[in-house]
From Swiss-Prot:
This protein's UniProt keywords: 4Fe-4S, Cytoplasm, Iron, Iron-sulfur, Metal-binding, S-adenosyl-L-methionine, Transferase, tRNA processing
UniProt keyword Iron-sulfur present: yes
Species annotation: Desulfitobacterium hafniense (strain Y51)
Cited SUPFAM superfamilies: Radical SAM enzymes
InterPro entries (alphabetical): Elp3/MiaA/NifB-like_rSAM, Methylthiotransferase, Methylthiotransferase_CS, Methylthiotransferase_N, Methylthiotransferase_N_sf, MiaB_methiolase, rSAM, rSAM_horseshoe
One MF annotation (Gene Ontology) recorded for this entry: N6-isopentenyladenosine methylthiotransferase activity
Cofactor(s) named in the record: [4Fe-4S] cluster
Known partners and oligomeric status: Monomer.
Record-given protein name: tRNA-2-methylthio-N(6)-dimethylallyladenosine synthase
Function: Catalyzes the methylthiolation of N6-(dimethylallyl)adenosine (i(6)A), leading to the formation of 2-methylthio-N6-(dimethylallyl)adenosine (ms(2)i(6)A) at position 37 in tRNAs that read codons beginning with uridine.
Length: 447
């Protein structure tokens, strides 16, 4: 009589940006090579991986709370392995502090050595606890693993790190200086993903617009987009994040000319005041940013623009804040990701005078959200009566009886439809809208 071996289960939790999600997928795939299968049930897991974020204090507090919650699972199942990785662990001096706070964790890894996770997991299984954080990246290595194989949508790293050093941002300190992947490696990964069923890729980098500046040949982000656009079987190409100072006319024209390059640009402006932009070390002015927006709208008239905004940066006056609100009204973003400034240890902004009180930051954030919600609603209401191409992603989270997907402009659409439409491109007539969602009726499918 043969005994069927029950596979071990891994649950991976990702916090923070899309790059953190991509790293979490990589860690999951590495675990699968050790025989683990993906699961969503923490109580049944044999391995729990938490890939962390440290961009804002609120994110860190949420992660620390989750790590604390895992302690009772470890007590109930001493064979359970818990691994914590990513940006929070990579911060200078963080490892010792975190290990003292969470002695139940088995594996600690930073951002530079996630491709070493199989070795770390083996060491933890054989010897017990292991902690390894590389101070600097030793190589630009992207695993051949297809971290998102079989998925409709995938994130693909094109570069790592950042050279901009915005004064509020911890990312260059935990991700290192900018390193571009070789284009052949990126294109090979995307082609392989398409073979497994992927139809949309999002190219990731802290600043995709500066991709290629460290390569040994003249090859920039626009060149990469052209090559990705030509891959057979790929329906959509997105990218993030773009730094305004590096957004060239060549890049805008490439997006406009592309077949599969989505008419959506995420272009963070962060603040509408030149004084605050200077303090942030953003390396552009309000006027320059608006000139880039104007050029985008001329070359890509149907473009959907999204952005990131920070309120309450040190020294921000009411006049500075009003300039931010005015810029929002002028540009008309379809969506904005809004945040209160969060002091990050080790960044120049953390040492600046005139730190803004929390109550003022909260008030400004609420004002900002109110203004942007009105802009988002107006943008979406203008789409009522139009027919949009939608990539169907799955059941709606708010109403499982309906399907959901996104337009090329990244607008979320909810509509009635059968499950067999998932993974296809359909035409949806937009009939209603709120500030966040379009509602419609499926008229035809393309693929």
């Amino acid at each position: 009589m043969s005994i069927t071996k029950v596979p071990k289960k891994v649950v991976t939790l990702a916090y923070g940006c899309q790059m953190s999600e991509r790293d979490a997928d990589t860690l999951t795939e590495i675990s699968s090579q050790k025989g683990y299968v993906r699961s969503q049930e923490l109580e049944q897991a044999d391995l729990i991986i938490v890939n962390t974020c440290c961009v804002r204090e609120s994110a860190e507090n949420k992660i620390l709370g989750k790590i604390g919650e895992l302690k009772h699972l470890k007590e109930a199942n001493p064979q359970l392995k818990i691994a914590i990785s990513g940006c929070m662990v990579q911060q200078p001096g963080a490892l010792e502090r975190l290990r003292k706070r969470a002695p139940h964790v088995d594996i600690w890894a930073g951002t530079h050595n996630i491709h070493e996770f199989q070795r770390l997991l083996e060491e933890a299984e054989e010897k017990g606890k292991v902690a390894e954080v590389w101070e600097k990246p030793r190589e630009t290595q992207e695993s051949v693993l297809l971290a998102a194989k079989g998925k409709l949508k995938a994130y693909v790293n094109i570069s790592y790190g950042c050279n901009n050093f915005c004064t509020y941002c911890i990312v260059p300190h935990v991700r290192g200086r900018e390193r571009s992947r070789q284009p052949e490696e990126i294109l090979a990964e995307i082609r392989a993903l398409v073979e497994t069923g992927c139809r949309e890729v999002t190219l990731l980098g802290q600043n995709v617009n500066s991709y290629g500046q460290d390569l040994d040949r003249a090859y920039d982000f626009a060149d990469l987009l052209k090559d990705v656009d030509s891959i057979d079987g790929l329906w959509r190409v997105r990218f993030m994040t773009s730094h305004p100072k590096d957004l060239s006319d060549k890049l805008i024209e490439t997006i406009a000319a592309g077949t599969h390059l989505c008419e959506h640009i995420h272009l963070p402006f962060q603040a509408g005041s030149d004084e605050i932009l200077k303090g942030m070390n953003r390396k552009y002015t309000r006027e320059y940013y608006l000139s880039r927006i104007a050029q985008i709208k001329v070359i890509i008239p149907q473009v959907s623009l999204t952005t990131d905004i920070i309120v309450g940066f040190p020294g921000e006056t009411e006049e500075d804040f009003e300039q931010t609100l005015e810029l929002i009204r002028q540009v008309r973003y379809s969506q904005a990701f809004t945040f209160m400034y969060s002091k990050r240890s080790g960044t120049p902004a953390a040492q600046m005078a005139e730190q803004i009180p929390l109550d003022i930051k909260k008030r400004r954030l609420q004002q900002l959200i109110t203004v942007q919600n009105a802009q988002s609603l107006a943008w979406r209401q203008e789409m009522i009566g139009k027919t949009c191409e939608v990539l169907v992603e799955g059941p709606s989270k708010s109403n499982p009886d309906r399907l959901t997907g996104r337009t090329r402009g990244y607008e979320l659409v909810v509509f009635p439809g059968e499950a067999q439409l998932i993974g296809t491109l359909v035409q949806v007539l937009i009939q209603d809208a709120n500030s966040w969602t379009l509602f419609g009726e499926c008229r035809a499918d393309r693929h």
